[in-house]
Amino acid sequence: MNKTFFLVVIMATVLVLAFDATDAQTNVRCTNTRDCFSFCSQFTNVHPACLGDYCECLRWEGGISI
């Protein structure tokens, strides 16, 4: 059972990283947060941020970023 658990954890991690990398290809490059306002305007209840030279639209719920 221990081997199965670790295999499932590894497979789930690989899937999360693969989908995260795919999503990152659609992001817009930025130099500051103001560049991200128009990109994030397509979403509701988000806060634009320029993180790692790319626009991120952060949604805060209960103090946890999703």
UniProtKB/Swiss-Prot annotation:
UniProt xrefs under SUPFAM superfamilies: Scorpion toxin-like
Positions of disulphide bridges: C30-C50, C36-C55, C40-C57
MF terms in GO: potassium channel regulator activity; toxin activity
Subcellular location: Secreted
Parts forming coiled coils: none
UniProt keyword list: Disulfide bond, Ion channel impairing toxin, Neurotoxin, Potassium channel impairing toxin, Secreted, Signal, Toxin, Voltage-gated potassium channel impairing toxin
Residues that span the membrane, as ranges: none
Recorded GO CC terms: extracellular region
Cited InterPro entries: Scorpion_toxin-like_sf
Domain of life, source organism: Eukaryota
Signal peptide as annotated in the record: 1-24
Tissue specificity remark: Expressed by the venom gland.
Primary location: secreted
Primary role: inhibits Kv1.3/KCNA3 channel.
Domain notes: Has the structural arrangement of an alpha-helix connected to antiparallel beta-sheets by disulfide bonds (CS-alpha/beta).
Family to which this protein belongs: Belongs to the short scorpion toxin superfamily. Potassium channel inhibitor family. Alpha-KTx 30 subfamily.
Miscellaneous comment text of the record: Negative results: does not block Kv7.1/KCNQ1 channels.
Stated name of the protein: Potassium channel toxin alpha-KTx 30.3
